[in-house]
Amino acid sequence: IKGEIIKDNTYIDNGTDCQYEIDLVSNRTHPDNFPFSIWAKLMREVIVEKSTALMDKAPSGGIMELRRTISFHLKQFRNMETEPEQIITGAGTEYLYNLIIQLLGHNKVYAVENPGYKKVAQIYKSNNVLCEYIPVDNSGIIVEELEKHKADVAHISPSHHYPTGVVTPVSRRYEILSWASRKEGRYIIEDDYDSEFRLAGRPIPALQSIDVMERVIYINTFAKSLAPTIRISYMVLPKSLIGVFYNKLGFYSCTVSNFEQYTLARFIKDGYFEKHINRMRNYYRN
């Protein structure tokens, strides 16, 4: 590009070559956008007020204070009716994907979106389960292809498909739920990654919020909304799977430290998370 950028970012066309540096990395948070001072304040409060609890072993699903806070947050922002007992926390969605495979079984056919997030398919394949690639159109995953490939579990991102950005309309969401209800043992993994940053149009309800057959396992993470290094993710199990989960996988230790869990719980409960999301929406719009 011919020209130069002077100190106040004004562009002047003076015939000289000018280079721009553009960061296209999708999972990075600029240091200026993270509320370090607030996070540090809450960490100090947790150390003082939760010193005994910090030394206790957390339940395998995570500390109840954070799970209650997430449950309330989901009701307020995703119209989801959940009980804290349905929520399982873990260090990253990859860890939760592995738990789901062990929970539902290695003998099922797992369907992923094509195109889609490459790591999801890699995780399924590394667990030696059959993984089918299902095409996506302008409304999301194609339901007829799920039947054609004899899928048992559909792993989808209906609120913000990666990499196309497609948002699955309500009509298609009901089609997907209908597919899951037609055969016993079918489930939908709703990956709601990045749903906080819907910048245009009216919000669409989470698939889990309109699921009356208990076939949706909802997954989300704070890696995008806060920072990728804050490895706190969670899933919401159907009530019918809670007992199965603890009978099969209750021996696992929670992979998120008590310290981070208590800090995040306060960050959400005290309203800082909502303020942060609103500020980041404005940042991304501009």
Question: Regions from the language model: what does each represent?
Answer:
Residues 13-15, 79, 185, 208-209, ...:
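Short secondary-structure boundary/capping segments
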Residues 43-185, 195-196, 202-214, 284:
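Conserved core of the PLP fold type I
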Residues 34-38, 199-202, 229-231:
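Short aromatic-enriched loop/helix-cap "lid" or pocket-rim segments at secondary-structure transitions
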